[in-house]
Amino acid sequence: MLQENCYVVNDETKECVIIDCGAFWEEEKKAITQYINDNELVPKHLIATHGHIDHNFGNAYIYEKFGLKPEVHASDEVLMNKLNWQAESIAGIHLDYEMPPVGKYLTAKDTIQFGNQTFTIIETPGHSPGSVFFYCEKEHIAFSGDTLFHNSIGRTDFEGGSKFMIIQSLRIICQLPDNTLILPGHGEETSIGKELAENPFLDR
């Protein structure tokens, strides 16, 4: 719907996590379940980098298919409680179904475990109060949501956004190794090193 990137991440154990399920159209939803079924994956978590509707359109579908409730940072509780309102006010879409309740509100002390993998949670407020990076140190990968993009950063003019906070968050994530692959919520993949070299908003 809003050209948002959804990720299904698995390892050799076949356990997987679904990140930022913004699937709105039926073909998008079916593509996710087909990938999971074709690869005989076992979904363990449905996680969101933040509480905006474009990253959560598919939550009801995933809950119906796999029984997973979304997990999101606690600071985005307000946003998660009004996803249907967001759909109407931001995307002009009336959803004729209710979203599932949040299964767990996350903090920086939590980790996401599946298979042999562990994601740590880096709090990156600014685009929204509860924006996070999901960081896998073992694989040198970070899922950045709408905080960091190739040559750009997230907007801060939405409810709860803060330009000051996103700048503080960028200073933190700049400390990740240069070879960290960044998989954003929109657009193409990049890396910390590339963004430090090319992104005008980043500076160590």
Residue ranges: model-predicted function:
Residues 18-20, 45-48, 121-123:
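Short catalytic-loop micro-motif centered on adjacent basic/acidic residues
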